[in-house]
Structure formats: C-alpha cells, structure tokens
Amino acid sequence: MIPGRIFLVLLVIFNTKPIHPNTLTEKYYESTCSVETAGYKSALRTGWHMTVMSIKLSQINIESCKSSNSLLAHELAIYSSAVDELRTLSSNALKSKRKKRFLGLILGLGAAVTAGVALAKTVQLESEIALIRDAVRNTNEAVVSLTNGMSVLAKVVDDLKNFISKELLPKINRVSCDVHDITAVIRFQQLNKRLLEVSREFSSNAGLTHTVSSFMLTDRELTSIVGGMAVSAGQKEIMLSSKAIMRRNGLAILSSVNADTLVYVIQLPLFGVMDTDCWVIRSSIDCHNIADKYACLARADNGWYCHNAGSLSYFPSPTDCEIHNGYAFCDTLKSLTVPVTSRECNSNMYTTNYDCKISTSKTYVSTAVLTTMGCLVSCYGHNSCTVINNDKGIIRTLPDGCHYISNKGVDRVQVGNTVYYLSKEVGKSIVVRGEPLVLKYDPLSFPDDKFDVAIRDVEHSINQTRTFFKASDQLLDLSENRENKNLNKSYILTTLLFVVMLIIIMAVIGFILYKVLKMIRDNKLKSKSTPGLTVLS
C-alpha cells in the first residue's frame, strides 16, 4: 500500500466527527401541507469503477481422503464442491442450464450493470486472463490494459493457494489426510471460508449479487481500491467513510473459473459530484370540506433535489438517496434534470417559471408522513389523531386538517390505529404561514383523481367545470323566466276575464233590479188612478 493510501486509512480511522457537520433546516409550508428539509450536501454517482478479482485455487487430489473421517478430509470435500459449483455457474460451462439463467438475469438488468457484464465477458477469454496473470506476476495489484483498450484494476488473492501449496499439501503427502495438526486445519478452514461464501453468494444469485459483501471484497481491499480511484482526496475521504453505502450500491459479477483461478468483477459506484446543496420535499394530503363534499390535493413533486451543473438533479422518490454524515448519496441513473426555478413551487405553486405538479382527489385520507425532524399529519373524517410524549402520554388531539408536528417534546403520533415514531434528528424548524391552497377550490367543481398534473391544468379543468355550471344556471334561469312570463300572462288574462264576468253579472243584476223596481212603481201608480165601484143589492 502506497503512503497516500495509508494516510487515507488513518484519516478515516481517527476522524470520528461527521465529515460534513451541517445544520439542517426544515420548513413547513402551511399553504401546501409540505416540508422542505435542507442542509445536505451531495454525493452523486456519475460512473462505475471496475476491479477484476482473482482468487487463486489449487488442484488437490482428494481421492486418497475419501476413506478418511478426519476434519481435514471433510474440509477438503467442501472446498472441492465449492469449486465445482463455481465452475457450473461460470459462463465457461456452455452446456449448463444455470448459465442461461445467469446470462438472462444479467442481461435483463439494464444499463446499471452493462459495463460490469461486458467486462466479465471479456475476461472470460484465456488471452485476457493471461494478460492479467502476467501483470500481477510480481504483485497482487496492478492496472491492466485489455485487448479491447479498456484499463482495469486487477487484484489477486493468493493466500488460500499459498497455504495449500506450501503448508497443507506437504503434510497430506506425508500422512495422507490424517493430519493431526489442528492449527493447520483451523487455518485452512479460515482461508477456505471466503471461497465458500463467495460460492454460496454467486450460487444463490445466479452469478450476480446486488451488493458487495466483505467476502467478495474485504475492507482492506475496498480501501485500497478507493485509494487508487482517479478522484480528489476529499471524494476518497467521503467514500471511505461510507463503505457500507459503497457496498450496498455495488455489484459482483461472476466471470470464469479455470484450473487455478476464480475470476469475478467488482463494480463499485464512483461518486463524481460532491458538496453541492441538496434538499428533500415531503408532502401530505390537504382537504377542504363543504357539506360532506371534499376537495383534496397533494404536491406531486416529492423527492430529492441536488444542484448539478447549473440545473437540478431530481430524484422522484425520497428513498432514492441514502444519507450518511450529512451527505445525500444518490444514483444519477435514477434522476431527472429540472430547472432551478422548480424550487419556487415551495412558496408559489402558481409561478409562471415552472409547472408545479399536484395530485387531486375527492376522497379524504387520514395518514402521516414522517419528515427528518417531525411529521406531517392529515387528519379527516372520524379518525382520532393524537400527539404523544413517552413520559406525559397524549399531549394533543388534532382537529381536522393538515398539521406539522415537530419532534421537539414529541415521541410519536397516532392516526387511527397506526403509530408513527418520530426521528430525533436535531435542526431548525420553521413554519411558513399561508392560507391552505385547497381552500380556494369548491368541492363541487374540483376534479377527481388527477395524478402528477400541472396546477394550471387543474385550474383549466376547474374553469371548464365552472363554465358548465354557469351555462346550466343560465339555462335554468332562462327557463324560469319563461315560466314566470307565461304565468304572468295567464294571471292577467284570468283577471281580465274575471273582471268582465263580474261586470256582466253586475249589469244583469242591475237590469233585473231596475225591472223589479219599475214594476213596483207602475203598480202603485195604477192603484191610485182607478175609482172605487159601489155594488147594489
């Protein structure tokens, strides 16, 4: 190991403080029921680093040990079985059914492993193996230029072969497998364990593992590989302090097993963009209720954002990035590129500089979304939503609506029967006040089940609905007006007819009264003018 690499190892060992002691700030935006947690620095994967690993093997004739019940004979049988299994798995076994399964799997994984698979296929060739063998003849590590022009780091693990050749075989040749040197047997078990675990992992994963275990690559080997990467000392420092992340994001690909060598490719992430600002957006559902009709919306731009070359790398899922020592380790293969103006959606969803995305629904949901330093709680309907302190019990019952609960003095939140435990991350919490965006919408005209759409499209849909309702109201008013006019005409005609009939009736009654009065008057006049008659007997 060169002095520079020794320095890196010592730096990681003695640096017990976080590499990036940043202060996190969590802002709750009341208008959109969302939280932005900022203060992280980036560690973005921009490529892969390939290493060809070669474990040297030894040919051991175990025929003479088959009749022995010794511990050594048992261990030799396990060693032989592991080598046979690896040969079956390797792409050199042309007639193997497992080979088809292996190739189908690695070819179906896409661009993430294309380079590693291509390299694994290349070093299957005897000519390439010979190049590697010659390059590492006098050292266990060397950069090898392959015939296809690719340069790779080649590492050789020969401790197992050296032990078998120099210590174990001489003993077997003298006393067969009845070796009573228990120290030698235990040492063989220890060295053999790596080969057995590598065989087990490749066998269980059809020749390709999605992580790099400490058997595939020891910590010492990993440190040596990172120390030789063509990146800055600061980048090496961050990667060496995050070995677990390096392993979880790496791959191991079986290449070949020949007479004396097991060859496989280790593909490690290369984090090329460092120390730019990163933040994460998390949101929950916000609803507006009128007469048991709901309008609900949520931001659809959740995820991680990191500055990268004048724009933002956007990772749609909050799980796309892994946090360690204040750094967000993210894979650019999972990212989208968005303009820096997208951050304006935090304070103004109607910004004209970017199409802010939301999802809509007419069905409420009560739930909680954990944030870095608290929790967003959406509480609606008849659900019980409580804030709990471990020592004091329930300290608050939440009304309907969206609420931000800081982790200060709070241990957990319960929504219905579900309990959410808050993290104990320390930082600064800020509440940005504002009228909930959802309050401006009428549940009757609110669109149902739109996912990841621009808010201007939602506005357009709402305006269309409002236009339809307005047109319907106008038609209804017109119909009512016509009915009212018809009713008025009927009323007038009826009134006129009644008046005419009343006049006629009164005229008839007047005429009759006139006739009766005239007859009475005529009779009186006649009785006065006629003389009286005397009757004689």
Curated annotation (Swiss-Prot):
- Membrane-traversing stretches: 487-515
Q: Quote a single Gene Ontology cellular component term.
A: membrane
Annotated region Fusion peptide: the residues are 102-122
Q: Which residues lie on this side of the membrane: Extracellular?
A: 26-486
Q: Does the keyword Disulfide bond apply?
A: yes
Sites annotated Cleavage: 101-102
Residue ranges that the Swiss-Prot or TrEMBL entry lists as coiled coil: 120-174, 444-479
Tell me, what's a Pfam family for it? Fusion_gly
Q: Which GO terms describe its biological process?
A: entry receptor-mediated virion attachment to host cell; fusion of virus membrane with host plasma membrane; symbiont entry into host cell
Family the entry assigns = Belongs to the paramyxoviruses fusion glycoprotein family.
Protein name per its UniProtKB record: Fusion glycoprotein F0
Organism expressing this protein natively: Murine pneumonia virus (strain 15)
